[in-house]
């Protein structure tokens, strides 16, 4: 079974979501189903159908989260001994050579990725171009608009 890479923070967020689904959402939907049942005929009960649909979503998400956490390979960036190389979990500051803008990204797992928060998926084109590089190197990224070049300004393990 293939391991799913997660940062410590990413694993914690999945655990929190799982706990919320089990302790809050699941009991609420069970109560909503019971309430809808009390209204009688289930064949034309939209409230019942909606609650059952929501229950299916919740149970599916619980199963998905339990599976991901069971196969997670949790990586703590502060414990990485990568000798300055960019690896999973690394936070890296780049300079776009065309615009001279600086951007900072953390390379994370698929479930953690959020470009608005500066978290990029390890399988994304930019992350793949950065992996293995060091401070001072230049990375070429194949983007939809063509090749972009970035200087690697800083590599941190935080």
Swiss-Prot record:
Function as written in the Swiss-Prot or TrEMBL entry: Necessary for efficient RNA polymerase transcription elongation past template-encoded arresting sites. The arresting sites in DNA have the property of trapping a certain fraction of elongating RNA polymerases that pass through, resulting in locked ternary complexes. Cleavage of the nascent transcript by cleavage factors such as GreA or GreB allows the resumption of elongation from the new 3'terminus. GreA releases sequences of 2 to 3 nucleotides.
HAMAP family cross-referenced by the UniProt entry: GreA_GreB (MF_00105)
Protein name: Transcription elongation factor GreA
Gene source species: Neisseria meningitidis serogroup A / serotype 4A (strain DSM 15465 / Z2491)
Coiled coil region boundaries: 46-66
Assigned keywords, A-Z: Coiled coil, DNA-binding, Transcription, Transcription regulation
Entry's Gene Ontology BP terms: DNA-templated transcription elongation; regulation of DNA-templated transcription elongation
Domain of life: Bacteria
Gene symbol of the encoding locus: greA
The family this protein is said to belong to: Belongs to the GreA/GreB family.
PROSITE patterns in UniProt: GREAB_1
Record GO terms (molecular function): DNA binding; RNA polymerase binding
């Amino acid at each position: 079974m293939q391991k799913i890479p997660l940062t410590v923070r990413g694993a914690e967020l999945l655990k929190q979501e799982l706990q919320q689904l089990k302790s809050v959402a699941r009991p609420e939907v069970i109560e909503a189903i019971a309430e809808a049942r009390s209204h009688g005929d289930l064949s034309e009960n939209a409230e019942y159908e909606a609650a059952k649909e929501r229950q299916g979503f919740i149970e599916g998400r619980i199963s998905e989260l339990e599976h991901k956490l069971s196969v997670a390979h949790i990586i703590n960036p502060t414990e990485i001994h990568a000798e300055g190389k960019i690896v999973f979990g690394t936070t890296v500051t780049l300079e776009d050579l065309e615009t001279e803008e600086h951007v900072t990204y953390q390379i994370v797992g698929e479930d953690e990725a959020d470009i608005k928060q500066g978290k990029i998926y390890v399988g994304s084109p930019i992350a793949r171009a950065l992996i293995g590089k060091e401070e001072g190197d230049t990375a070429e990224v194949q983007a939809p608009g063509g090749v972009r070049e970035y200087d690697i300004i800083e590599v941190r393990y935080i």
